[in-house]
């Protein structure tokens, strides 16, 4: 895998608050190599390590995108939800930003059935099929469609398991991470000072609470994916 330059600037990361970890009482000792100091009761993340692993992650997603691989971005907490959907749409990735339904990947056959149902209902709605039904039946189907849109809207075009999963907040998305580990799907995870850095294939130490920090990390990964996709289109 070729190393590339991704213009990851330490001062820019500081302005985004990427270096602010959790309180010193709320930490995982395995994160010690990624912490540079304690300040006013919180751990400070070593941004040199952040830059190194973010760069590695960018190389990985660029390489995968240049070979036509598929990505899934997962971030369901309120602060991350909008950022995740916008980033995924920009990079033409699948995403989950409301709730991770247990077994979404490990029980893929069930997820596929839900997606087929979702597509059928969307077709019915577009062709005004609901209007031909009794009001009560139409209302039931509309509620079903609304629920499926909420939870599966970001993966409606997914036809198989993703090649790489990007996780925003390891603690929040632990179930998704475990499913990826079970299936052997490579993962890139944004990890704060309360996380285990040994679980994901590439762990990026960073503040997972600040919107600016999450945006910074996502923007770099999305740029790398878009560059890789351009390379794939040019070479195909």
From Swiss-Prot:
GO molecular function: structural constituent of ribosome
Domain of life: Eukaryota
InterPro entries, alphabetized: Ribosomal_uS2 (IPR001865), Ribosomal_uS2_bac/mit/plastid (IPR005706), Ribosomal_uS2_CS (IPR018130), Ribosomal_uS2_flav_dom_sf (IPR023591)
GO CC annotations on file: chloroplast; mitochondrial small ribosomal subunit
Localisation: Plastid, Chloroplast
Keyword Ribonucleoprotein tagged: yes
Record's keyword terms, sorted: Chloroplast, Plastid, Ribonucleoprotein, Ribosomal protein
GO BP annotation list: translation
Pfam families per record: Ribosomal_S2
Family according to the record: Belongs to the universal ribosomal protein uS2 family.
NCBIfam families, sorted: rpsB_bact
Protein name: Small ribosomal subunit protein uS2c
Organism of origin: Arabis hirsuta
Organism lineage: Eukaryota, Viridiplantae, Streptophyta, Embryophyta, Tracheophyta
Protein encoded by which gene: rps2
């Amino acid at each position: 895998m070729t190393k590339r330059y991704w213009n990851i600037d330490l001062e820019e990361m500081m302005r985004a608050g990427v270096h602010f970890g959790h309180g010193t009482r709320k930490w995982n000792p395995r994160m010690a190599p990624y912490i540079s100091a304690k300040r006013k009761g919180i751990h400070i993340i070593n941004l040199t390590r952040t830059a190194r692993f973010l760069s590695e992650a960018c190389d990985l997603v660029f390489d995968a995108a240049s070979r036509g691989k598929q990505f899934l971005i997962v971030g369901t907490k309120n602060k991350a939800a909008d950022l995740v959907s916008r980033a995924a749409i920009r990079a033409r990735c699948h995403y989950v930003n409301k709730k991770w339904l247990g077994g979404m990947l490990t029980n893929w056959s069930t997820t596929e059935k839900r997606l087929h149902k979702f597509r059928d209902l969307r077709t019915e709605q577009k062709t005004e099929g609901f209007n031909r039904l009794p009001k009560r039946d139409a209302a039931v189907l509309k509620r079903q469609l609304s629920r499926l849109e909420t939870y599966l809207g970001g993966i409606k075009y997914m036809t198989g398991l993703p090649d790489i999963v990007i996780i925003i907040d390891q603690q929040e998305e632990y179930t998704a991470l475990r499913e990826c580990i079970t299936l052997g799907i490579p993962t890139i995870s944004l990890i704060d000072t309360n996380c285990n850095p040994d679980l994901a294939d590439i762990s990026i130490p960073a503040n997972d609470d600040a919107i600016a920090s999450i945006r910074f990390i996502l923007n770099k990964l999305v740029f790398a994916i878009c560059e890789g996709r351009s390379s794939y289109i040019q070479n195909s």
